């Protein structure tokens, strides 16, 4: 006999369609916030979001009379018909699924409403009452996936990756993530280039080119990699349509590969992000729970290919290459005379071997990366401190508090703060490059405070050391070449910020002398033989190209 499903089973099925991980819950609530016009979003995870999940925004808010409908199935203010989907969420299932899966608490107030509303829901029980509330919406979820044995650390990692992805498509959103009360991500809405540094890493982000192109009401913006950066999978190539993160359609991927076909080896893909802004008739969204698949019109795919080709022509990259190499003219050699270095190999995962002319170079990869990061920090400090997304409280020991009036050079250059009661200050501003590292901010503030006569440059040298690639870290050819190219652009490439050498040079004439060859003898001309005890075991040598 066919029977209608009971309400509790419908709720479980709805949860299964929408919520598989904490990341899914955060995605749904984040999209609700973006649809509400939020400019600031705060995410809190307790127990990886399994014990408690909070998403708070400064968006439009939900009127008190609409709060009960917000947690009903297929209830939404966003969708009138299937041809007019202009929001990230549209199915009206997310809050209903959360209500069925956990204890749900929603506090919300539109800006024009006097006072807010509070909704408490669990299963079929729903209670609403008026309460004081700031403008915006705060959603709290308790007991999500209770008893399922989830890994809290894995859930946090998933949420962090999700938020980094959304920042690539909403780079003006001020976004904060806290796990167990500790800040894991603080992004001030500083734009796409800063979002790329966060998502791809600083070294790779430097190898991305800005893209902006439009025609006939279609527009594409983003960042795409130079030819020297590529991957064998398209897993670091991200796409959004009107702010919605979506999977790369196969047709568009073919167009991208065709645009890069003279720049990348066969089977390689670029790295980057494309943000498409399209009228509704230019794409079709697949109406599944993930909302990740789109079908794009031929005109859109052609526009993206045209945009890439125009960019490559402008950057003088549109030419056949035997292998991926950067073709943009390098800056003139430094005063030290360092020429353009060609990567050969990595030795013991710590040193890069490179050649230039008749000289073999051995480069300490950690010291080189330190120098690159240090000079980048020097340039970025000159931009001055920027407001933090949220002020950060820093506890101080009595001796540290006494140093506040000393006016250390590094402290004044990097931070703005105000006293916040005994033994605490509230950080208001910091350099933008420190915003993505909230756990490091108090430490850097105290380091600058305790300066003990050390200069700003000494502090920046220490900061450059922390994230620099370490000895023992394997680097591929593209990564090694990118590191060498970035080193060449430095003003002082020969020494790290601490004064240690970055590279050693061994000229061909030194090799000729040490191997007992005649000057200029290549591949056969032998000098007088060494005594037997000085001879090295013979081994085949690679032919010179």
Swiss-Prot record:
NCBIfam families linked: mutl
Database matches in PANTHER family: DNA MISMATCH REPAIR PROTEIN MLH, PMS, MUTL (PTHR10073), DNA MISMATCH REPAIR PROTEIN MLH1 (PTHR10073:SF12)
Superkingdom per UniProt: Bacteria
Keywords: DNA damage, DNA repair
Annotated SUPFAM superfamilies: ATPase domain of HSP90 chaperone/DNA topoisomerase II/histidine kinase, DNA mismatch repair protein MutL, Ribosomal protein S5 domain 2-like
HAMAP family in UniProt: DNA_mis_repair
Gene: mutL
Role summary: This protein is involved in the repair of mismatches in DNA. It is required for dam-dependent methyl-directed DNA mismatch repair. May act as a 'molecular matchmaker', a protein that promotes the formation of a stable complex between two or more DNA-binding proteins in an ATP-dependent manner without itself being part of a final effector complex.
GO cellular-component term (any): mismatch repair complex
UniProt-annotated stretches for the region Disordered: 517-545
Pfam families: DNA_mis_repair (PF01119), HATPase_c (PF02518), MutL_C (PF08676)
GO molecular function, one term: ATP binding
Gene Ontology BP term (one): mismatch repair
InterPro entries in the record: DNA_mismatch_repair_MutL (IPR020667), DNA_mismatch_S5_2-like (IPR013507), HATPase_C_sf (IPR036890), MutL/Mlh/PMS (IPR002099), MutL/Mlh/Pms-like (IPR038973), MutL_C (IPR014790), MutL_C_dimsub (IPR042120), MutL_C_regsub (IPR042121)
Listed transmembrane segments: none
Protein name: DNA mismatch repair protein MutL
UniProt family annotation: Belongs to the DNA mismatch repair MutL/HexB family.
């Amino acid at each position: 006999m066919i029977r209608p499903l009971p309400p509790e089973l419908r709720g479980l099925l709805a949860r299964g369609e929408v919520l598989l991980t904490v990341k899914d819950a955060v995605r749904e609530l984040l999209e609700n916030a973006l649809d509400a016009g939020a400019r600031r979003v705060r995410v809190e995870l307790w127990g990886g979001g399994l014990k408690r999940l909070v998403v708070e925004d400064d968006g439009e808010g939900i009127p008190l009379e609409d709060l009960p409908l917000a947690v009903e199935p297929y209830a939404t203010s966003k969708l009138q018909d299937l041809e007019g989907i202009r929001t990230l969420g549209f199915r009206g299932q997310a809050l209903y699924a959360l209500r069925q899966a956990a204890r749900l608490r929603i506090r919300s107030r539109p800006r024009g409403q006097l006072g807010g509303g509070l909704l408490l829901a669990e299963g079929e029980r729903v209670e609403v009452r008026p309460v004081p509330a700031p403008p915006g919406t705060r959603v709290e979820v308790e007991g999500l996936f209770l008893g399922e044995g989830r890994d809290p650390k894995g859930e946090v990692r998933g949420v962090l990756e999700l938020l980094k992805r959304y920042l690539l498509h909403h780079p003006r959103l001020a976004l904060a993530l806290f796990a167990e009360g500790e800040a894991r991500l603080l992004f001030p809405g500083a734009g796409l280039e800063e979002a790329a540094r966060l998502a791809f890493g600083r070294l790779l982000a430097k190898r991305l080119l800005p893209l902006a192109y439009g025609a006939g009401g279609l527009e594409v913006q983003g960042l795409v990699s130079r030819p020297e950066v590529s991957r064998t999978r398209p897993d670091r190539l991200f796409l959004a349509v009107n702010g919605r993160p979506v999977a790369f359609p196969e047709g568009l991927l073919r167009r991208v590969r065709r645009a890069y076909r003279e720049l990348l080896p066969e089977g390689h893909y670029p790295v980057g992000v494309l943000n498409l802004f399209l009228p509704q008739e230019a794409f079709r969204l697949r109406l599944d729970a993930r909302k990740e698949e789109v079908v794009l019109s031929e005109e859109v795919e052609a526009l993206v290919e045209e945009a890439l080709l125009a960019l490559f022509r402008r950057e003088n990259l549109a030419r056949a290459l035997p292998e991926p190499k950067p073709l943009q003219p390098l800056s003139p050699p430094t005063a030290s005379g360092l020429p353009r270095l060609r990567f050969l190999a990595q030795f013991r995962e710590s040193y890069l071997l490179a050649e230039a002319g008749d000289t073999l170079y051995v480069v300490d990869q950690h010291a080189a990366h330190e120098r690159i990061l240090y000079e980048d920090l020097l340039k970025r400090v000159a931009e001055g401190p920027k407001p933090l997304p949220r002020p950060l409280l820093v506890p101080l020991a009595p001796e540290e508090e006494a140093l506040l009036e000393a006016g250390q050079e590094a402290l004044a250059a990097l931070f703005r703060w105000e006293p916040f009661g005994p033994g605490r200050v509230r950080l208001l501003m910091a350099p933008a490059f420190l915003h993505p590292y909230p756990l490091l901010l108090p430490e850097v503030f105290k380091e600058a405070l305790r300066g003990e006569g050390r200069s700003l440059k000494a502090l920046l040298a220490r900061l450059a050391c922390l994230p620099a690639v370490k000895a023992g870290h394997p680097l591929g050819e593209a990564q090694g070449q990118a590191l060498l190219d970035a080193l060449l652009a430095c003003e002082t490439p020969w020494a790290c910020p601490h004064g240690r050498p970055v590279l050693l040079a061994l000229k061909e004439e030194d090799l000729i002398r040490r191997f007992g060859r005649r000057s200029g003898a290549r591949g056969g001309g032998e000098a007088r033989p060494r005594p037997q005890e000085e001879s090295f075991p013979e081994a085949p040598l690679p032919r010179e190209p």
